[in-house]
Amino acid sequence: MKNKIKVFRAMHDLTQEDLAQIVGVTRQTILAIEKGKYVPSLDLAFKIARHFKVNIEEVFLYSEEGRTIDVD
């Protein structure tokens, strides 16, 4: 699943470790999510979006059959 976590982290001057501690996961989990190698649970996705005070759709881009669906 494509996402903009790295962009939001940069905007808020957070490291992967910082965000991991905030949402209660490991740095490796944040890295895997950013690289699209791990799809977060709905609970974790909401925690990440809430931390940045944005809608979940602004952070995560839903992909169906390899296509990214633009939710804007």
Residue ranges and their predicted role:
Residues 60-72:
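Short, charged recognition helix plus adjacent turn
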Residues 35, 54, 64:
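Short, conserved catalytic or interaction motifs in soluble domains
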Residues 25-38:
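Recognition helix of helix-turn-helix/homeodomain-like DNA-binding domains
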Residues 20, 31-32, 55:
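Alpha-helical and His/Cys-centered functional microenvironments
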Residues 3-22:
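Short basic helix-loop element that most often maps to the first helix and adjoining turn
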Residues 17, 28, 57:
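Key DNA-contact positions within bacterial/archaeal DNA-binding proteins
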Residues 43-58:
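DNA major-groove recognition helix of helix-turn-helix/homeodomain DNA-binding modules
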